[in-house]
UniProtKB/Swiss-Prot annotation:
InterPro entries: THDP-binding (IPR029061), Transketo_C/PFOR_II (IPR009014), Transketolase-like_Pyr-bd (IPR005475), Transketolase_C (IPR033248). This is 2-oxoisovalerate dehydrogenase subunit beta. It comes from the Bacteria. PANTHER family: PYRUVATE DEHYDROGENASE E1 COMPONENT BETA SUBUNIT, PYRUVATE DEHYDROGENASE E1 COMPONENT SUBUNIT BETA. It holds the Pfam family Transketolase_C. SMART domains: Transket_pyr (SM00861). It comes from Thermus thermophilus (strain ATCC 27634 / DSM 579 / HB8).
Amino acid sequence: MALMTMVQALNRALDEEMAKDPRVVVLGEDVGKRGGVFLVTEGLLQKYGPDRVMDTPLSEAAIVGAALGMAAHGLRPVAEIQFADYIFPGFDQLVSQVAKLRYRSGGQFTAPLVVRMPSGGGVRGGHHHSQSPEAHFVHTAGLKVVAVSTPYDAKGLLKAAIRDEDPVVFLEPKRLYRSVKEEVPEEDYTLPIGKAALRREGKDLTLIGYGTVMPEVLQAAAELAKAGVSAEVLDLRTLMPWDYEAVMNSVAKTGRVVLVSDAPRHASFVSEVAATIAEDLLDMLLAPPIRVTGFDTPYPYAQDKLYLPTVTRILNAAKRALDY
């Protein structure tokens, strides 16, 4: 075991997979000599050379399109988009080509590639460096979507994503890149895509989150415990496919659920989860599902902390559910 930040865990995952499998290549803006804007790919160019670690032009469409071509010809590319906000010039390639290659080729071709994206707010980056666009991806059939919150999960799920036979959008909470450290195994391991993590057991209320907001979700659960409320905490980790069984079992047990995300509220991913809970567990709910999200505005520069879900907002939502 070694104490790692998320950046270090991601770097270790890439290094191990490149050493293990010569088909794994890395491409993106500044991923080579500079090691990526957040240094996730630091040292890989020096170790594996320019044929496997490739700096690209500033063109997300080219990055995603090139990754698809590489994947179709037998490689396992890991493409980096500097910020999730920048994916939209490459959105057509991702949605129209990458996500649909297996389907439209009748299974003759697959797209075993990963598109890594630093996502979410909390770094005062404004509307071009703070968005959480996961709803766009989970709405696209053919993509798997991962959103990690810990170094341990980051390493295990990135390795699983690289080995997956289908395209994976891998969302990394930039706010947690270096603010969270934990012991991470140095040996090889993977975590299953599609399985949530039970962070805390409880019986009165279920709190569900993923990615950027998990520290606040866990802090809210701790505050509720001081008030005698037993809150169960689920970290979804994977948004597509999300862990239906874990969510339904937890909410059926507690009867109350608060869903937390830093994405805008309208048509958010947690709205889909809330709707599914309401449809399938209506007769077991003691209160309606309650969402705590970002706001339906462009991401602000000056009010970054007010945009993100706070512990206070989560506690207020929990009180509503408990008092219903």
